[in-house]
């Protein structure tokens, strides 16, 4: 039937892990050679998108009394920022760290990788700070009579008070998930 023919044409081929890595490595070659201003703009966008995910998760979870449910809701909403990054092709530092695979395979130099990572890191930082400023000016933190602002400060303080080992381990686990998403 015509409907089954359309379905057959739309089938997606699943890549093996080896094929996925090869595709990613080839994509890294173009990424490290991208002009700095383009990388920077794409990185600003990614920083804003991740900040949108964080802000959305805070809005969704800030007034939920049950801590487990609040964390579940925040955990469901936050990845929307990462999905926006992946779907738009924006540049996120955590995912770009995976470009070291192409460096190891000598597809580009370590200097090009470091340049890209610095540009993307600074762009992500600027993008996230820009969105945070916009959130502040918009009065979003006054939502629920200031409860959202207090919740945001509580989350930030919790992260700032992590000991180095815990923060490092959490960062590594987070980066594994981000790298899996961008592959």
Residue ranges and their predicted role:
Residues 11-183:
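Alpha-helical transmembrane segments and their helix-helix packing motifs
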Residues 1-7:
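Short, small-residue-biased leader/transition segments that mark boundaries at the very start
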